[in-house]
């Protein structure tokens, strides 16, 4: 199988790729290397720090877009798989759906949107932030809420 893994969180995609390659699959990882952790990847999609960093990353994504097609499975690490604005994500997602067999959304890592969604709409019966309709009051849940929502 041909598998594309987009994004990275705590070495999940890099180690998954290594295991899948051992099993004989063709795997490509495109990520920002999870920032300072510098995990391995095949296509580096790191956003710089300059005033034009977002534009440069967008150009890099467009330049590599042809490499993101004809896969049996594409897994994105979470809804914010690139350090770009949401409208750019929508364009990339449409391309991925059109040019690949299956698209899988992971829920790795944590970001503002994940925390907010789990607190407000509670799409999961059990999450880091809720048990059923009840918001979790434990220390870890409170720390994560403060870190991401202020």
Label every PLM stretch briefly.
Residues 50-56, 82, 133-141:
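Short, flexible loop segments at the rims of nucleotide/cofactor-binding pockets, characterized by
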Residues 11-15, 58-62, 87-96, 142-147:
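Short alpha-helical segments and helix-capping/turn motifs at coil-helix boundaries
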Residues 2-6, 65-88, 102-106:
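Short N-terminal targeting/anchoring amphipathic segment
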Residues 68-69, 91-98, 123-150:
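Membrane-proximal helix-turn-helix segments that form the acceptor-binding/catalytic region
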Residues 1-41, 99-101:
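N-terminal subdomain of nucleotide-sugar transferases
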Residues 30-38, 104-123:
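Short, solvent-exposed beta-strand-terminating loops
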Residues 45-48, 121-125:
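Short, hinge-like loop/turn segments at secondary-structure boundaries
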Residues 47-67:
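Glycine-rich, highly charged phosphate/nucleotide-binding loops
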């Amino acid at each position: 199988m041909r598998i594309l893994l987009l994004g990275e969180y705590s070495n999940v995609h890099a180690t998954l790729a290594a295991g899948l390659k051992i099993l004989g699959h063709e795997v490509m990882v495109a990520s920002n290397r999870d920032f300072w952790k510098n995990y391995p990847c095949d296509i580096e999609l790191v956003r710089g720090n300059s005033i034009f960093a977002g534009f440069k990353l967008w150009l890099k994504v467009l330049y590599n877009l042809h490499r993101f097609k004809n896969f049996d499975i594409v897994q994105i690490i979470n809804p914010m798989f690139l350090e770009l604005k949401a409208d750019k994500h929508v364009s990339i997602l449409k391309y991925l759906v059109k040019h690949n067999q299956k698209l899988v959304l992971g829920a790795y890592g944590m970001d503002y949107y994940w925390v907010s969604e789990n607190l407000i709409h509670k799409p999961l019966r059990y999450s880091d932030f809720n048990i059923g309709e009840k918001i979790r009051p434990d220390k870890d849940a409170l720390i994560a809420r403060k870190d991401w929502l202020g």
